[in-house]
A protein has these predicted regions:
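Aromatic- and acidic-residue-enriched segments that line the glycan-binding/catalytic groove
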Residues: 72-87, 120-146, 183-204, 249-256
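Glycine-rich, aromatic-flanked loop segments that form ligand/cofactor-binding clefts
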Residues: 11-19, 59-70, 94-144, 180-182, ...
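The substrate-binding groove and active-site-proximal loops of carbohydrate-active enzymes
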Residues: 26-41, 79-95, 145-164, 204-216, ...
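Catalytic domains of carbohydrate-active enzymes, especially glycoside hydrolases
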Residues: 42-71, 173-178, 267-277
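Active-site neighborhood of glycoside hydrolase catalytic domains
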Residues: 158-294
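Aromatic-lined carbohydrate-binding/catalytic grooves of carbohydrate-active enzymes
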Residues: 57-93
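Active-site-adjacent "subsite" loops/lids of carbohydrate-active enzymes
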Residues: 14-16, 22-45, 103, 113-114, ...
Length: 294
């Protein structure tokens, strides 16, 4: 006797068990700076230890932080190395961290996805430390200062092209299994976000909220199609805000994807421009359960 289940009820053929490896401030990795050959070996050993623990815990996917805020953890012709590697902005660590991470993940039968922070560029101190290597200096037209931080302007047509230039470096040169986009959204409560000029120029009669949602969706679409044109097998994902919008009974308290940061995640999935979504479910009790039901 065969039992037929509706598609929504069928378990996936392959379960994704993923973990982020965070390089910002060395939260997960690295703890050691590569100021010597011994430093290189120790930094690599720290990453191997994390991967061994993930493998032992039956994880099969690693989201390895590859771009932070206008700086990177791979050899790029566009943005400088993150200072967390050597203690110096743009300092060459003596090896390619992304290539090393991919090789070590594959040795353990795990996928390695390049996790790339997209829109935020960091606070004033961080941007100043990057100096002339900062995108705020090289591509000033697509950058916006807001609340003592800098952001790429999602409403500027060149923003998606700039992001794709970084993605192209990664996908063409590395054997990544996926590309994972973080902070692909406007900052929270961005009513005064400095995009009035681009809105007047490109709004085409849409209200501000819809125009901003369309901007984010267009970046998602452009990056997805760009990756698939290079390597169709590379998976494309994002980590959106975990609450799509307010429910009829519970508000999101000012933090939801659709209204607050202009992510139309259901629209992305309906259009087929995401392979995976990792919603940020940082909630408890009534801050989580009613939204999960919805």
């Amino acid at each position: 006797m065969a039992v037929l289940l509706p598609l929504a009820a069928q378990p996936p053929k392959h379960e994704v068990r993923a973990a982020w490896i965070t390089a910002v401030y060395g939260l997960d990795w690295p703890q050691t700076r590569t100021t010597s050959p011994e430093g290189i070996r120790k930094q690599q050993a720290e990453l191997i230890e994390i991967l061994d623990r993930l493998k032992a815990a039956n994880f099969n996917t690693v989201l390895f932080q590859t771009r932070t805020r206008g700086d990177v953890l791979y050899k790029s012709a566009i943005e400088p190395y993150n200072s967390i590697l050597t203690g110096k902005v743009g300092g060459d660590p003596g090896y390619d961290p992304l290539a090393f991470a991919i090789a070590e993940c594959h040795k353990r039968g795990m996928e390695c996805h390049a996790w790339m922070v997209t829109i935020p560029l960091g606070n004033r101190k961080h941007v100043a430390a990057l100096g002339k290597e900062s995108v705020t200096k090289k591509k000033r037209a697509i950058c916006v200062p807001y609340k003592r931080e800098y952001f790429l302007n999602p409403g500027h047509p060149q923003t998606k092209e700039y992001l794709m230039s970084l993605v192209r470096e990664v996908v063409e040169r590395y054997d990544v299994d996926g590309v994972h986009f973080d902070y692909l959204r406007y900052p929270e409560h961005a009513l005064r976000f400095s995009d009035s000029y681009t809105y007047r120029k490109y709004g085409n009669g849409r209200d501000l909220a819809q125009w901003r949602r369309d901007n984010i969706t267009e970046i998602v679409r452009y990056l997805y199609k760009g990756v698939k044109a290079l390597k169709p097998w590379v998976k494309v994902s994002t980590c959106p805000v975990g609450k799509y919008r307010d429910t009829s009974r519970y508000p999101s308290r000012g933090w939801n994807a659709f209204h607050t940061v202009y992510q139309d995640v259901q629209g992305w999935l309906g259009e087929g421009i995401q392979d995976q979504v990792y919603p940020m479910m940082y909630f408890r009790g009534n801050g989580f359960y009613p939204f999960a039901l919805d």
